[in-house]
A protein has these predicted regions:
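C-terminal luminal/periplasmic domains and tails of membrane-associated envelope-modifying transferases
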Residues: 1-154
């Protein structure tokens, strides 16, 4: 069993505790999983990190979910900024890696939006603006209706 899979197991078990109504035990398991197998030892991946973020949100520990989400997001931003500096053939060689990192950041972005994490969205919006993303393409946390949804009259 790889260390990454072991970390995923903590999140799976924690979610089961949430479904059973024991959020305290779920948070304890999530904390233990990150303590025993921290991101400094096991690099962030969507598979071994998103379940922890979701678990914290589901268990009623949004601050812990936000902290982990932003830590992973900052890690992705560093990679993205690094790969954006590559030019020519080197740039071509890292294109798929850059796309993968952007997709991971997008998943975090949409998770934050889905969970209604306004402060996190605001921070991620600031970063997306540095990449040249237009304002109308961003999710605005202060608006009750996203720009890509339709209001149906009653």
């Amino acid at each position: 069993l790889s260390a990454s899979k072991a970390r995923e197991s903590f999140a799976r078990a924690a979610k089961e505790y949430v479904f059973r109504g024991d959020s305290t035990q779920a948070i304890r398991l999530l904390d233990m999983g990150l303590e025993k197998l921290p991101p400094q030892q096991i690099r962030y991946t969507d598979a071994n990190t998103l379940p922890f973020i979701e678990g914290y949100y589901m268990a009623g520990a949004p601050d812990k979910g936000d902290g982990l989400l932003m830590s992973y997001a900052r890690n992705l931003m560093q990679y993205i900024d690094y790969y954006l500096d590559f030019q020519g053939i080197q740039g071509d060689m890292v294109t798929q890696t850059l796309i993968d990192k952007m997709q991971s950041l997008d998943r975090l972005y949409y998770l934050a939006a889905y969970m209604g994490r306004q402060d996190v969205l605001a921070q991620l919006n600031d970063y997306y603006r540095t990449l040249g993303i237009y304002e109308n393409e961003l999710i605005h946390p202060d608006l009750s209706t996203p720009s890509d949804s339709v209001q149906i009259p009653e």
